Amino acid sequence: MNKKTFYITTPIYYPSAKLHIGNTYTTVAADALARFKRLTGHDVLFLTGTDEHGQKIQRVAEEKGLKPKEYLDNMVDSIKELWKSMNISYDKFIRTTDDYHIESVQKIFKKLYEQGDIYKGEYEGWYCTPCESFWTESQLDDHNCPDCGRPVEKTKEEAYFFKMSKYADRLIKYIEENPHFIQPESRKNEMLNNFLKPGLQDLCISRTSFDWGIPVSFDNKHVIYVWIDALSNYITALGYNSDNQELLEKFWPANVHLVGKDILRFHTIYWPIMLMALGIELPKQVFGHGWLLVDGGKMSKSKGNVVDPVVLVDHFGEDTVRYYLLREIPFGSDGLFNNELFIKKINSDLANDLGNLLSRTVAMVQKYFNGIMPAPIAKEPIDDELINLALDTREKVENNMEKLKIPEVLDEIWTLIGRANKYIDETTPWILAKDEDKKDRLGTVLYNLSETLRIISVLISAFIPKTSERINEQLNVDLTTWDSIASFDGTKAGTKVVKGDALFPRIDVEAKIEELNSLKEKKEKKEIKPIKEEITIDDFDKIDLRVVKVISCEPVKGAKKLLKLKVDLGGEERQVISGIAQYYKPEELVGKSVVLVANLKPAKLRGELSQGMILAAATDDDSKLFTVSIPGELPTGSQVR
């Protein structure tokens, strides 16, 4: 009999920087779903990979003095090492620089062009390099990207466009007729009401301003933009447009595209429209999970709250990280991470609840039965509640996993763990052991605990697989299939248990946090932005830096981030427009001596003339900025050299 298939994907990650705990969350969740489906008898394909083209990759590689592919090869190695350390069981890793993907993408582009869904035009507007997104003037937030808040660049270039509006009504109808296509429900409503129903603009799908990308096969001046290149990985990985489409026929449509909420629009609007144009069935579901908030906010280097999963694995082991992410983050909503919560959860759930249950059970089998598993020959009514809960939990777990309710699954399993610990207190094995006539009853109690642990081990195997293996080793059981936990008899009497190390040693919370903070401080001191390429003294001499005094300062109308300064250059008054309104109130700058790039060519910003630029130092993500100040005794007009 053929197995049911299950195809699950993560986004392909953009390797312009190291992956962080948020990327890890997506991949761990996908891995848990993939492992569970394998456990329940499905033929699974779990796809992940890297999105390797684009202007940002090209720039980052250049900054490091590397060719893009050389830079990418190093990054991909580190990503694969991360997934190995997190025990990620992906079946295929796709890179958009793979030859088969490039060839397939070129064929997709050509097909869409030849059938009239793509046309050539000219793009003029604003571009965000980090997000690889184009924006119209009306969409900008004070000339910053509405998605990430970073500055955008004005661009004008010839481009190919995809006729999105042609398929919009058809997609709206599909979403409304297939309520499970976009999940959670709130995300579906957002896509319909905020993007689709107001109307779609045609989508720019090629670039000419950089060359690190897949060339349009019939127009080499253009490279194919991220939308077709990256999104199509879900079918090119299965052999679409190749001589062997066996995987495509077997696994498509995907059961779940798992993505972060920030890229849900691309996966629920752009991607399905492309599939409609290609005549390909849509994926069954796109699930947009929430963000991982660190200490109440998004991660950023300047805040010092970026969480490196490698550090956590090194200090606590991969299963602690997997457990916290899967249990504590509401699947579909934002969730919190901080070291204190994380360590306390290890101590309470993993060390106290699960670890102690195993340790006490194995220790008592060793102490009272020389390590040989007794037979359950003296049952009592008090056993039924534990046995029934153990058997019922299997069905509850399966039902919740069908609905992608991962935290609820772990809640059910930990309810069983709690009940088993309570059963020890109720049956008091240490008292039974004092009465030789109660030997059979003692053996039954310990068998029930051991069999419950075997069932727990199977139940947790998709979520914390290494821990599951360690439990099986100590119980010395090999019956670990999903079907085997439909009955309460998988542990065999006469088996010799093997006492091992504690699953999760208790951690001194304060000492460990102090250690992690110390490591982070050392790491931050080492990390500095790469120095730009050398210039000569002649190059530097071209820049005329002068001391100026701020005479007046006021906001620029209609621009939240701009200030209009009048400065004294030593007898000459100038007007300067500076993007520092979010860091300084106008009155804080008046009377201050600052440094001006005096020979910068004048330019108009928001209709106001700017005659120079104020020097300032900022963090990498622009969350903090300070002007370069000069002691008041230096006269205005003095040269800075």
Curated annotation (Swiss-Prot):
Binds 1 zinc ion per subunit. PROSITE patterns: AA_TRNA_LIGASE_I, TRBD. Its cofactor is Zn(2+). It catalyses: tRNA(Met) + L-methionine + ATP = L-methionyl-tRNA(Met) + AMP + diphosphate. GO terms for biological process: methionyl-tRNA aminoacylation. Residues 539-641 form the tRNA-binding domain. HAMAP family: Met_tRNA_synth_type2. Belongs to the class-I aminoacyl-tRNA synthetase family. MetG type 2A subfamily. This is Methionine--tRNA ligase. It comes from Clostridium tetani (strain Massachusetts / E88). The lineage of its organism: Bacteria, Bacillati, Bacillota, Clostridia, Eubacteriales.
